[in-house]
């Protein structure tokens, strides 16, 4: 069923047993998921047991969420819609919670075990509303979710345990709180974008995520330590700048193919010897505006020099500007400054105060 860019409101299509696809891109006539409109109405696509694809990108869908009673649904695309949140099943909600508490209620996907892609972008949700913790618990086939609500959310990210097929986890610039997920058991994960939230605590260790290519957790409120990367051989991009991370820079030997390590504007003080010596494809390292003590800074420079000796190359940028401990600018020792000069002569752009 195709009505993209026609201006036709989303019709009632209940009990269409062979219907597989509904496509209504950029339909600007206001519609809801219910007929008649409102919470007392009936879900327009109930009884469509073979419905697989719901493409409503840019459609002016307003109002509350339905429970998607379509067991074959694979794709729900609700990017740039005007859904306000709430709805779903109102029974069995946690004590003290109502449907209006949620930008996306916890139970709307409980019949969607085949769901692969869930995309939702809306600026119309209520400020301070949250994501249901159980949202994806029935979605064992989920590969890709993208949720963006323009900084209006609060509360934590949904439970992601048991999502062994998950490849992309995007929930950026939302205002989410709590701690970062470890993606344990999600060994297919490729891309993580959780930047621009209010996550606190530590960055967990990431283990056996052999497909992980990029991990973006910058611009949060992370104030703990950093875990290790263990058997993350395909990680290229790690961004965790603009947080309040403390402790030591972790050992990156378990992510030897890292290209970009961006950690400026944190409170890191220590360095684990060997952490960077084996990251031989590194192109860009930014540790500016941290709190390393001189011994840590010296060891770091020693390892960068070892890195170059192991894999001679130019074009690498290293930013170590404004390293201060207790407010005092930290300068490397003479031996390490000599190594910096050698790296610069080899074509490395090493920035120091």
Regions found by a protein language model. Give the residues of each.
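Consensus "Asn ladder" position of solenoid repeat domains
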Residues: 6, 27, 59, 81, ...
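Conserved hydrophobic beta-strand positions in leucine-rich repeat
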Residues: 1, 22-24, 54-56, 74-78, ...
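Leucine-rich repeat domain C-terminal region
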Residues: 265, 277-333
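LRR N-terminal entry segment and analogous cap-like coil->beta motifs
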Residues: 1-10, 15-33, 97-98, 112, ...
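Conserved hydrophobic position(s) of the canonical leucine-rich repeat
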Residues: 7, 19, 30, 51, ...
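The leucine-rich repeat
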Residues: 8-10, 33-43, 64-66, 86-88, ...
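Leucine-rich repeat
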Residues: 15-18, 47-50, 69-72, 111-114, ...
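Extracellular/surface-exposed low-complexity segments
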Residues: 330-353
């Amino acid at each position: 069923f195709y009505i993209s860019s026609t201006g036709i409101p989303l019709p009632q299509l209940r009990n269409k047993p062979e219907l597989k696809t509904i496509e209504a891109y950029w339909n600007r006539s206001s519609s809801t998921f219910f007929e008649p409109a409102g919470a007392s109405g009936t879900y327009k696509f109930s009884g469509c047991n073979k419905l697989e694809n719901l493409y409503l990108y840019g459609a002016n869908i307003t109002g509350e969420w339905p429970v998607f009673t379509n067991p074959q649904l694979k794709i729900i695309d609700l990017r740039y819609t005007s859904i306000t949140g709430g709805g779903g099943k109102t029974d069995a909600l946690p004590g003290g919670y109502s449907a209006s508490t949620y930008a996306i209620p916890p139970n709307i996907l409980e019949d969607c075990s085949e769901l692969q892609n869930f995309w939702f972008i809306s600026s119309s949700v209520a400020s301070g509303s949250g994501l249901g913790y159980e949202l994806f618990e029935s979605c064992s086939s989920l590969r890709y979710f993208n949720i963006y609500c323009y900084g209006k959310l609060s509360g934590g990210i949904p439970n992601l345990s048991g999502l062994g097929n998950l490849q992309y986890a995007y929930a950026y610039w939302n205002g989410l709180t709590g701690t970062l997920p470890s993606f344990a058991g999600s060994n297919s994960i490729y891309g993580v974008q959780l930047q621009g939230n209010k996550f606190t605590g530590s960055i967990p260790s990431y283990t056996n995520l052999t497909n992980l290519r990029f991990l973006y957790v910058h611009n949060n409120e992370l104030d703990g330590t950093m875990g290790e990367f263990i058997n993350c051989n395909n990680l290229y991009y790690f961004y965790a700048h603009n947080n309040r991370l403390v402790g030591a820079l972790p050992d990156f030997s378990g992510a030897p193919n890292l290209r970009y390590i961006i950690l400026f504007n944190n409170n890191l003080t220590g360095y684990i010897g060997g952490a960077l010596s084996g990251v031989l494809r590194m192109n860009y390292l930014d540790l500016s505006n941290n709190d390393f003590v001189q011994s840590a800074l010296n060891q770091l420079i020693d390892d960068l020099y070892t890195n170059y000796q192991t894999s001679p190359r130019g074009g690498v940028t290293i930013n170590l500007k404004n390293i201060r401990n207790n407010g005092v600018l930290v300068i490397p020792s003479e031996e390490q400054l000599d190594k910096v000069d050698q790296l610069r002569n080899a074509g490395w752009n090493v920035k120091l105060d």
